[in-house]
Design a protein with these regions (language model features):
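Glycine-rich, proline-tolerant flexible connector loops at the mouths of alpha/beta enzymes
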Residues: 5-24, 180-191
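Alpha-helix-loop-beta-strand connector modules within alpha/beta enzyme cores
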Residues: 18-42, 76-83, 132-147, 192-215
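Conserved structured catalytic cores and adjacent interaction surfaces
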Residues: 53
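Electropositive phosphate-/nucleotide-binding environments in soluble metabolic enzymes
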Residues: 19, 23-26, 47, 71, ...
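Active-site cofactor/substrate anionic-group-binding motifs, chiefly glycine-
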Residues: 1-10, 26-34, 40-41, 60-61
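Catalytic alpha/beta core domains of metabolic enzymes, predominantly
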Residues: 80-179
Length: 219
């Protein structure tokens, strides 16, 4: 595990769902990551939060699916030197996603990581459809890293391993995976979180797949 991700501010479909712990949570998150010797990534929802993010030395800023076309937000992070994970909007085309990245790059920040997190289709059995095809397309169209979020794509913990394997086989450079020591007690996204033991097992499987393809994802 290279980086710790957590949401101090949580964009939720319902205003009555848990919205995160705010700036206090960001401080606790920073402290926990420092104790573990890990950098942090967290989602930026509002340009008014940016100063606090910089004060807490957020290592990587995440632009979530709902903010992919928040152009003022994209312009602001484009002025920084902080790496940005740009998640695909749930109904966004590849072209729209690429143009969102251009908003960031046009400000001078080329430290952009694309994250495929599933798109909305007519299917209702699972949350979203992980667009594995997007991985080789982005690899062809850009020189930038591409990662996937199998947790939000399927929305269920039992889907995470299969989607992760598909993503690595298709050429993804990394994963964003929800993990919790006791998923049933998680305040949000409990259904899609896997345990630390399951994550360790998954990483061994993914390393084996990558090795077959002549890649090393262990570094």
């Amino acid at each position: 595990v290279k980086i710790m991700r957590g949401g101090a501010f949580k964009p939720r479909t319902s205003p009555y769902s848990f919205q995160g712990t705010g700036f206090e949570g960001l401080e606790m998150f920073r402290e926990a990551a420092d104790n573990a010797g890990l950098p942090i990534v967290t989602e930026l929802l509002d340009v008014r939060h940016l100063d606090k993010f910089l004060e807490q030395k957020v290592d990587v800023i995440q632009i979530g699916t709902r903010s992919m076309q928040n152009f003022e937000l994209l312009r602001e992070v484009g002025r920084l030197k902080v790496p940005v994970i740009l998640k695909r909007g749930m109904s966004a085309t590849i072209s729209e996603w690429l143009m969102a990245a251009e908003y960031i790059a046009s400000g001078g920040n080329h430290n952009i990581i694309f994250c495929e997190r599933g798109i909305r289709t007519f299917e209702t059995y699972y949350r979203n459809v992980l667009d594995v095809t997007a991985i080789p397309v982005l690899k062809k169209e850009t020189h930038l890293p591409v990662i996937i979020d199998p947790s939000h794509a399927g929305g269920k913990a039992w889907m995470v391993a299969a989607l992760s394997r598909a993503g690595i086989a298709a050429g993804a450079d990394g994963l964003l995976v929800e993990m919790h020591p006791t998923p049933s007690e998680a305040w949000c996204d409990a259904d899609q979180a896997i345990t630390p033991t399951e994550l360790q097992k998954l990483m061994k499987e993914l390393s084996a797949i990558a090795n077959i393809l002549g890649r090393d994802i262990s570094k």
